[in-house]
Amino acid sequence: EIRIFSRDEKKQDDMRQFYKNPKIKYFIGDVRDRLSIDNAMKGVDYVFHAAALKQVPSCEFFPTEAVRTNVLGCENVLDSAQFHQVKKVIVLSTDKAVYPINAMGMTKALSEKVMVAKSRNLNGSGTVFCGTRYGNVMASRGSVIPLFVNQMKSGQPITVTDPNMTRFMMSLES
């Protein structure tokens, strides 16, 4: 069984219509709400924690919301997973958590620190917390590629914040 836990009802409905698979179960909830996580977490073996506020401007304008989702939400997922004896939780992070210069990177770096600290206190519970950092995934929501393409198509200059900046790109192709 695969469980989808998200606060986005529309995306869940789109997935339900597209996949039409009785082995996929859908749970409406928010990582900020531990009780809704607990409801979905019962009997789960593996968790891929991808919930985040990841748009840099949104996190800059609403840093408290970024902390609530990216840091406290991650803590809720980890606590629930440990309580329900999940085998492994994979926390998805970002390359922007390395030497962060904005609120999104800072909150993701802090969520990684929360994960590492909680890993030290698992006390042989059988649950494992691990994380991975993604760079710019081409064709993903929030990727800089569509912005660059739109700027080129409309004859605008490509916005580069620093000419010495390096961006790492990865594709979903194998």
Name each model-derived stretch.
Residues 1-11:
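Conserved glycine-rich Rossmann-like NAD(P)H-binding loop of the short-chain dehydrogenase/reductase
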Residues 17-20, 25-46:
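Conserved Rossmann-fold cofactor-binding substructure of NAD(P)-dependent oxidoreductases
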Residues 103-104, 109-174:
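NAD(P)-dependent short-chain dehydrogenase/reductase
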Residues 26, 91, 131-133:
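Conserved beta-strand scaffold in the Rossmann-like NAD(H)/NADP(H)-binding core
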Residues 11-17:
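Short alpha-helix adjacent to the SAM-binding motif of class I
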Residues 6, 27-28, 68:
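Conserved residues in the N-terminal Rossmann fold of short-chain dehydrogenase/reductase
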